[in-house]
């Protein structure tokens, strides 16, 4: 079995999760300006030092937990990165040479989230439709769905799988968000009823922090929200329903371009 599978079993046996384990990194060596900024914007309060303890981001000796390390501005966890590519066409056959846009991001999960959403926004178009008294905005992708899918990828990915990172791949007709690690409970998402998925959390500390920052709801899964947002789009058709796929070591969300193949 791959080493990450053995590590998963060890953690399971200890009733511990990756994000709560203490790292070798000292809290005092890292800045958390993005986290502080977001906390202030969301709650209206400055982030007090003691919150780093109650958020389980550091231990009593001043060492960061893995969750803390993942949220440091300059995160020392090197495989926490985001690769974004806008491919030319419907697949990757043209290769990177032909890619229309590409970027790689590292740092705090908050940076990855913001940069990922910005990358998608700059690579999509918005159409307008005139109605009797106003005009309707029709973007290629529902920004809320992109946001939810990326939060999901960053928070629920398996950080024990090294040499793999989160990818956003944009094609002419769709975009995919890929993350290492299948469903935390070992099931296959494509065989499940999305409306009844209980949130088994691979990284409960990260999920809790993102909940406190207003990035995700404490209860329930983002899958339903991704699909509902799509269905509510002005230019939605049934064949454009978002697709979810997982296997033992990966998870992928496909969001379809709502304007692809339709007359302008």
Regions found by a protein language model. Give the residues of each.
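Active-site helix-to-loop segments that bind/position phosphate- or nucleotide-bearing substrates
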Residues: 1-164, 170, 186-188, 192, ...
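Flexible, glycine-/charge-rich segments associated with ATP-binding catalytic modules
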Residues: 26-28, 78-82, 90, 187-189, ...
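Short, highly conserved beta-strand within the GHKL-type HATPase_c fold
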Residues: 172-181, 185-186, 252
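Short Gly/Ser/Thr- and Asp/Glu-enriched loop/turn motifs at secondary-structure junctions
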Residues: 65, 172, 246-250
